[in-house]
Structures are given as C-alpha cells and as structure tokens.
A protein has these predicted regions:
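Polyanion-binding surfaces on beta-sheet-dominated domains and ring/shell assemblies
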Residues: 2-167
Length: 167
C-alpha cells in the first residue's frame, strides 16, 4: 500500500490514504465499494471469531464517516467466545442520571469495568424500569467491548448521539 504525501500551503503535510487504509486507520468505510465493505466486515468477524451470518455489526454515518457499531449479537458472541463473565454491577444515581457500572473478568484473570448512564428525569413506571434495564445493558455491553480490546460503539450508545444516520 502506498500513501500519497503532498506538501500543502503553509508547509502543512497532507497524506491521502487509499480507501482500504481509510477504513483501517480512520474507521471511514464510505470510500470502499460494496464488495470491499463486505470483505472488511467478513475479515473483522473472522478476526474476532464472530458468526457473520448473525449480523454482529451494522453501519452508521457518524460525524460524516461511515462506520460500524457492535450490536447485541456481537457482544453476546464475544462474551461466549472469550468466556467473559460479568462479575458484578454497581448502581448510583447522580441527580437525574442513573449509572450502572459493570465489572467483567476473563479466565486468565484480566478484569475491567465500564459504565452505562441514562437520564431518568421525568420517568416513572414502565419508562423508568426500561431506562434502568437499558443502563444495565449499556454497562454490560461497554465492558464486554472494552475487555475484548474493541474501542467501538455498541448499539446501546447510539440513542444519545445526535449527529447520526443509519444505513
């Protein structure tokens, strides 16, 4: 792979990545053809031992970049394949924010934790119960991705992002 390096005005260096490098380095899949995108997703699934037929990743346009996010299928499979255990959860409420911290461990002794938080202002009854369950789910999915070394969005985080478009 070769990058085109161009010296721009005011001695600013610009690197023009080819489409596959953009996907790998910048996380932008928009310049890939349909076939290249399918290949990228297939390779990602294979590298993580995920079943591609279960659609563990979905596309989203975020900040002008076409990217992938991990859905429930991805995090459920990752927990099973990597034998990730959610060892405990802790709950806290700060003002109108309901926070759940999930702790995870792997058989080799690695541990991690991550938090899911939701605004519960003006919620009651079933809406409050659903928000609490969402915060738990968000924390568990986030810690799963984290302990597996994947710095990517999961679907439980998407509703709080305003500038997004699903494909």
């Amino acid at each position: 792979m070769s990058n085109e390096v161009v010296l721009k005005e005011e001695n600013k260096l610009e690197i023009n990545f080819n489409p596959y490098e953009l996907a790998l380095v910048k996380g932008d899949l928009s310049k890939l053809s349909d076939v290249e995108r399918a290949s990228y997703v297939k390779n990602l699934c294979e590298s993580l031992s995920l079943n591609m037929l279960t659609k563990p990743f979905e596309y989203i346009v975020l900040n002008g970049k076409l990217t992938l996010y991990a859905n429930k299928s991805a995090t459920d499979q990752l927990r099973q394949i990597r034998k990730v255990s959610i060892t405990k959860t802790e709950v806290a409420q700060v003002g109108d924010i309901y926070m759940v911290t999930a702790y995870a461990a792997t058989p080799d002794g690695r541990t991690d934790c991550d938090t899911g938080a939701l605004n519960i202002k003006n919620l009651g009854g079933d809406n409050l119960a659903n928000a609490i369950m969402k915060a738990i789910t968000k924390a568990k999915r986030r810690v799963t991705l984290s302990i597996c070394g994947l710095g990517m969005l999961d679907e439980s985080e998407l509703e709080t992002i305003k500038e997004k478009r699903f494909l």
